[in-house]
Regions:
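Short, non-transmembrane alpha-helical segments in secretory-pathway proteins
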Residues: 25-53
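Short beta-strand edge/turn micro-motifs at domain boundaries
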Residues: 92-121
Length: 133
């Protein structure tokens, strides 16, 4: 009985603590390719919705083996004022991405939201909560 309990405890600890999370907030020579790829995917999605080209001030970009969490501020590439709807809360952007067969895909992305839409998202997608810190 003790062996079964020990084995279960060990499996739970591996699944909980086995995820390595890396911050890509700052661009370095080692993370430039992946960081740029993730940000380009977010830019393309925002362009479809807002027809404006954006660059990001990255506040958080945490990456695990399967997921990436982004929080940042969108700024127009031409440095003009961002055009949004009257009810939008400019200019913050948050997004969850998933890596599938080596490619990143957007799972959830919200720009200029007026609420904390991502509360509990870690439970919805079974993502380590540490990714969001």
């Amino acid at each position: 009985m003790k062996n079964i309990f020990f084995t279960l405890a060990l499996l739970v600890s591996f699944s909980t603590f086995g995820q390595k999370i890396e911050s890509l907030k700052k661009k370095t020579s080692g993370n430039t390719k992946e960081r740029t790829l993730i940000l380009d995917i977010l830019r393309a999605s925002l362009y479809q919705d807002y027809k404006q080209e954006f660059i990001f001030i990255v506040n958080t970009l945490n990456v695990s083996s399967q997921y990436a969490w982004f929080q940042g501020t969108a700024v127009r590439k031409d440095r003009r004022e961002v055009r949004t709807n009257d009810y939008d809360d400019c200019c913050h952007v948050e997004g969850l991405l998933k890596r599938n067969y080596g490619k990143w895909y957007i799972v959830e992305l919200e720009a200029f939201s007026t609420d904390v839409w991502y509360d509990g998202i870690w439970d919805d997608y079974n993502v380590p909560r540490a990714l969001f810190n």
